[in-house]
Regions:
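N-terminal beta1-alpha1 ligand-phosphate binding loop
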Residues: 2-24
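Short gly/ser/thr-rich secondary-structure transition/capping motifs
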Residues: 21-28, 56-59, 130-137, 169-171
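Short acidic low-complexity segments
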Residues: 26-37
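Short acidic/histidine-rich motifs immediately flanking catalytic phosphotransfer sites
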Residues: 35-45
Length: 188
C-alpha cells in the first residue's frame, strides 16, 4: 500500500488518483502507524513549510516518516514534499526556521527575485523550465527514459538548497535543485 501523507494541506486527491490510475494501491492517511508500516510513501506538495512542519510534528507524522525511511521504505516527495526532506525551511516561519525531516542537510529558502547581475525575475516562478542532470543522475530511476534538457512545469516561491543529493537543476534567478535523491529509495 502506498501512503499519500495528509498533513491537512496538499494536492492529495490528484496524487492518489494518479497513483491509482497507473495501478498503485494508494490511500490518503494522516495516521502515523499507517505511515510507519506502508510499502511506500508519497509526501505531496502545496501549502507552507511552517504549517506542514507544525502539523507533522504535532501528529507524530515526522517521526513515523523518519522511522519508515530508516527501514528502507521508498519515498517520493513532490514540491513541498521535497523541501520537507531538508533540515528546515523558512517559508511562513515567523520565528526563523521550522524543522524538516532532516534527511538532507540544508534549509529551504525563498527564491531570490534577482539574479547575480541584478536582473529581476517574477516570483512565484510559474512555468516550464528545462532541467539539467547531475553527472550521475542518468542512472536514477526517477529519470528513466527522460532526456537531459527535458522541460518540467514549476509553480513555487521557495527552493531547496544545493546538496550532495541534487540530481537535477533548473534556473530561475538562481540555479537550484529540481530533483534530489538519497540512496536508491528516497526521491523528490
Amino acid at each position: 500500500m502506498i501512503a499519500v501523507i495528509d498533513y491537512c494541506k496538499g494536492n492529495l486527491k490528484s496524487v492518489e488518483r494518479g497513483l491509482t490510475h497507473v495501478g498503485g494501491d494508494a490511500h490518503i492517511t494522516d495516521d502515523p502507524e499507517v505511515i510507519r508500516t506502508a510499502d511506500a510513501l508519497v509526501l505531496p506538495g502545496v501549502g507552507s513549510f511552517a504549517d506542514a512542519s507544525a502539523t507533522m510534528q504535532q501528529t507524530g507524522q515526522m517521526e513515523a516518516i523518519r522511522a519508515a525511511l530508516a527501514k528502507g521504505t521508498p519515498f517520493l516527495g513532490i514540491c513541498l514534499g521535497e523541501h520537507l526532506l531538508f533540515e528546515g525551511g523558512t517559508e511562513h516561519a515567523e520565528h526563523g526556521t521550522m524543522p524538516g525531516l532532516g534527511i538532507i542537510d540544508g534549509i529551504a529558502k525563498r527564491m531570490p527575485a534577482q539574479d547575480s547581475t541584478g536582473k529581476a525575475y517574477k516570483i512565484p516562478h510559474v512555468g516550464w523550465n528545462s532541467i539539467e542532470f547531475a553527472e550521475d543522475a542518468s542512472v536514477s530511476p526517477l529519470f528513466a527514459g527522460i532526456p537531459n534538457g527535458e522541460y518540467f512545469y514549476f509553480t513555487h516561491s521557495y527552493i531547496a538548497p544545493k546538496s550532495n543529493a541534487t540530481i537535477a537543476t533548473t534556473t530561475h534567478s538562481v540555479t537550484f535543485p529540481a530533483a534530489v535523491q538519497v540512496g536508491d529509495r528516497i526521491f523528490a
